[in-house]
Amino acid sequence: ASAAPLLHSAKQDRRRVLLISGLAGAGRTSALRALEDIGYEAVDNLPLELLPHLVGGLAAEADSGRAASGEQPIAIGIDCRSRGFSGRDFVERIQKLRTTPHLEVILIYLDCEDEVLIRRFTETRRRHPLAPDRGVADGIARERSLMFPVRGMADLVIDTSTRPNADLK
């Protein structure tokens, strides 16, 4: 599926809110930068507990007439590193946000093959955020388990295995 319709055409009278999530190393930050380049306001690493406050503020602006569908769309990066993260809690929050008038909430999930993620972590000499004292493969397995419900409700799943981060644009 192509991401183009999801990125460029908000429904009438709705402000577009893209939630970008997925596995560490799959390119979330690069995707947010690319979205910023095409006019999105980008927020990265938003703690899950702050999501309703940020999006609720956008909805309040729209309700008061200060913002409309022509306003700058926003892309929000959220991953499982947030304190107290729960995939089920994330899914429940998204379901609730999707009922918010004047907002079009779309979830994009970035995925990647384990071998490619391991190579990316090795090349950058970074540890996996969920396995600071264990191997990268352990962190990836733990993260896949945590993110399983999120991936299942995504409007679009993008596999970045064959794409260098620079190609996410």
Residue spans for each PLM region:
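Conserved nucleotide-sensing/catalytic segment adjacent to the nucleotide-binding pocket
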Residues: 36-98
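Glycine-rich phosphate-binding P-loop
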Residues: 19-35
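Switch/connector loops and helix/strand junctions flanking conserved nucleotide-binding motifs
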Residues: 84-87, 114-121, 129, 147, ...
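Small-molecule kinase domains that catalyze NTP-dependent phosphoryl transfer to phosphate-bearing small molecules
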Residues: 130-168
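Conserved phosphate-donor/acceptor-positioning beta-strand/loop module used by diverse small-molecule
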Residues: 101-125, 158-161
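Extreme N-terminal, non-catalytic leader segments
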Residues: 1-16, 51-64
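Short glycine-/polar-rich loops that comprise or flank the Walker A/P-loop
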Residues: 38, 70-73, 101-106, 152-155
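Pre-Walker A (Motif I) flank of P-loop NTPase domains
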Residues: 13-18, 71-74
